[in-house]
Amino acid sequence: MRRILVLNGPNINMLGTREKAIYGRRDYDSLCAYIRSAAARLGVEGELLQSNYEGDIVTAIQKAYGAFDGIVINPAAFTHYSVAILDALKAVNIPAIEVHISNIHQREEFRHHSVTVAGCIGQICGLGFAGYALALEALAVYEPEA
């Protein structure tokens, strides 16, 4: 059974409260339940972590080395400037997919660029909670080309 680490960055714990027009009314507990259900359906083991602290996310990525087969990451605001998260993703060389609930390319200009995606095999954005399920599904079957 593949093990997938699901990381959520700052303010994702505030789902259901913050900017409902962008993120919807479902809360973080609903997201976690959705992810767990998708993981079970796909036959993968999913472990979830949310942190508002960049260093905690870097540490979680580093600890994933040798323990996880894939990473689903929503770096949230760290997406746009965290070279530390990018470097951690590159260091562990675990297939990772960046996920965003909203479409970052349809929002403010500063959100259009992702620094962290360069450490990922792909990006899914704008599909709400379903983006997490799609990322899990992709990692469940992913085989590196080389």
Model regions and ranges:
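Short Gly/Thr/Asp-enriched flexible loops that form oxyanion-binding sites at enzyme active sites
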Residues: 63, 82-91
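Glycine- and acidic-residue-enriched helix-capping/strand-helix junction motifs
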Residues: 15-29
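Short glycine-rich anion-binding loops that position phosphate/pyrophosphate groups of nucleotides
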Residues: 10-12, 76-79, 102-104
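Short, acidic/small-residue loops that bind anionic groups at enzyme active sites
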Residues: 90-107
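Short acidic/histidine-rich motifs immediately flanking catalytic phosphotransfer sites
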Residues: 64-71
